[in-house]
Swiss-Prot record:
Protein name: Holo-[acyl-carrier-protein] synthase
InterPro entries, per database record: 4-PPantetheinyl_Trfase_dom, 4-PPantetheinyl_Trfase_dom_sf, ACPS, Ppantetheine-prot_Trfase_dom
Pfam families: ACPS
One MF term in the entry's GO annotations: holo-[acyl-carrier-protein] synthase activity
Protein origin, superkingdom: Bacteria
Cellular compartment(s): Cytoplasm
Keywords attached to this entry: Cytoplasm, Fatty acid biosynthesis, Fatty acid metabolism, Lipid biosynthesis, Lipid metabolism, Magnesium, Metal-binding, Transferase
Species of origin: Bordetella parapertussis (strain 12822 / ATCC BAA-587 / NCTC 13253)
Substrates-to-products reaction catalysed: apo-[ACP] + CoA = holo-[ACP] + adenosine 3',5'-bisphosphate + H(+)
Amino acid sequence: MSSVSAAGATPPASPGCIAGIGMDLLRIERIERALARHGDRFAQKILGPEELAKFHARRRRDPARGVRFLATRFAAKEAFSKAIGLGMRMPMSWRRVQTLNALGGRPVLVIGAELADWFDARFGAAHVSITDESDMAAAYVIVERKPAPDGRP
């Protein structure tokens, strides 16, 4: 909910304010069916290069873990596309944003060069949270407003 001033106008945002929120929830079996139907082409269409390497490594060790990995990354990309207000249309595409892990394991969004200029001109930081449990995978993305050049709201 946005606050409204007495004059009826929305007050200006301060740096670090939320510009967009995206969420995606999906059944993991949906990803299993897509993999069964399309094989590795499905993973190659969805995942960026680092994600794809991790997917193959996890799937070799445990096929179910590979599917869960793909499902969480699919959800993160959907959530990100919603947070930035584009959906899956240019300059956004599946492979132009990856969800990788920081040293401590925290998921981080890595925006590819083809999308970075567009994103950086409009937004500040992006944050992601992903989870999977039982038969579901989910992701939440929060995108911050771009701070003003002088740092003022």
